């Protein structure tokens, strides 16, 4: 196992190119199950979650190749591998998004056997809304020894609400959308997730011949079609990776230019950084983050898009820990998502958690120590804290980080961080 070692206190400067969005790439790769003919998908990051998804799709009969320009060629040959319908536990347990093969398998092969998903341990994330939506389209669903077993004759369009206890469901919307594109008749999804990654899947499917309207809103209308064809498509840039690098610039009082960003997907993050006192200049597909001033504490509430994403909460917590004064974070998506606060406290942060709130009494003095990563974004928060902590920070269990960030230590090092990856 590897760990990351950071010597804090170095200002970051320079340019960084943002990769394609992991959370758009995973459902789009799964949706290739629906297509007749080859697809070429550009901008897919080289991270562990993508490697896991490639294994799952190969298991289902996919022919997947890395193309020289960094894109991925994916083809499922019609008529072959109809019997391959299983996404096994040993792969699915590694990441939650692997459940998004359920809709395409059911739609294209009439059967699916998918293990209950894994991923990061951040509280209740059930898939009941996925199953409710698929049942409404006519699927028969049972569970057996940790597997969802789904079967269907012809799926039929209907009206479905995906509203749940915790609001909308991103992967549930993806699963129902991919199941509905080849269904008979029209499907209306109410309370659909509006996240850019859901929009990206819809645009991808439309390019392949689907008829989806209302993209970006909470009501999606899907007219079923007979067939979808292969396409060339470029994934949107990763708004969470972009936000993470923005905070890296802010927390070290540096100046970073981000290239390949969609600033329209980053409005809430940019607005909050400006409120804190960070200078952010968003222009076309670049953004420049710099700071000369004193920062102000802030209150943050995580909510579904277009509000501040829960996946940026740990990174903002790290920043707020370094700003004198009282800040409050309200975590409205995953109320238990504060595991990283205990590790930040080890570094000297003053954080009190009273779910779903965390109250931070910030001060500019964090100290390096040994900390452990509990989940992907918590890992990013600890790296950011390590960049400014006095002394040396050792970050253990970084396999969580590798699930979502490609070579984060090399990219931060290029910006001037004193950061290395070493074997434990």
Predicted regions and their residues:
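Short, structured segments at the rim of ligand-binding sites
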Residues: 1-424
């Amino acid at each position: 196992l590897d760990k990351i070692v950071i010597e804090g206190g170095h200002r970051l400067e320079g340019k960084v190119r943002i990769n394609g969005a992991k959370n758009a790439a995973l459902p789009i790769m799964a949706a290739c199950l629906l297509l007749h003919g080859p697809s070429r998908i550009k901008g897919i990051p080289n991270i562990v979650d993508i490697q896991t998804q490639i294994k799952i799709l190969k298991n289902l009969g996919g022919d997947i190749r890395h193309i020289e320009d960094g894109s991925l060629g994916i083809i499922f040959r019609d008529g072959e591998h109809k019997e391959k319908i299983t996404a096994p536990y040993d792969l699915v347990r590694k990441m939650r998004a692997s459940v998004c093969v359920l809709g395409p398998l059911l739609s294209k092969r009439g059967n699916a056997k998918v293990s209950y998903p894994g991923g990061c341990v951040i509280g209740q994330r059930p898939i009941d809304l996925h199953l409710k939506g698929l049942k409404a389209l006519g699927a028969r669903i049972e569970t057996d020894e940790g597997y969802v077993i789904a079967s269907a004759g012809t799926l039929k369009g209907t009206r479905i609400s995906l509203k749940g206890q915790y609001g909308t469901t991103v992967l549930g919307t993806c699963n129902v959308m991919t199941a509905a594109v080849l269904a008979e008749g029209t499907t209306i999804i109410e309370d659909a997730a509006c996240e850019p990654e859901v929009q990206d899947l819809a645009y991808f499917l439309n390019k392949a011949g689907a008829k989806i309207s209302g993209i970006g809103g909470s009501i999606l209308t899907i007219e079923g079609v007979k067939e979808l064809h292969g396409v060339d498509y470029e994934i949107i840039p990763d708004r969470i990776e972009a936000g993470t690098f923005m905070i890296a610039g802010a927390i070290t009082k540096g100046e970073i230019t981000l290239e390949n960003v969609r600033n329209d997907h980053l409005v809430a993050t940019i607005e909050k950084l400006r409120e804190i006192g960070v200078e952010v200049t968003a222009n076309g597909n670049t953004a420049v983050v710099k700071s000369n001033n004193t920062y102000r504490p802030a209150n943050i509430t995580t909510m579904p898009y277009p509000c501040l994403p829960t996946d940026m909460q740990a990174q903002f917590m790290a920043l707020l820990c370094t700003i004198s004064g009282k800040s409050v974070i309200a975590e409205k998506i995953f109320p238990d998502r504060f595991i990283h606060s205990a590790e930040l406290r080890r570094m000297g942060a003053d954080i009190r958690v009273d779910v779903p709130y965390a109250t931070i009494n910030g001060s500019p003095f964090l100290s390096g120590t040994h900390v452990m990563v509990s989940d992907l974004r918590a890992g990013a928060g600890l790296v950011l804290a390590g960049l400014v902590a006095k002394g040396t920070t050792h970050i253990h269990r970084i396999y969580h980080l590798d699930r979502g960030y490609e070579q984060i230590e090399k990219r931060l090092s290029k910006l001037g961080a004193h950061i290395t990856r070493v074997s434990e």
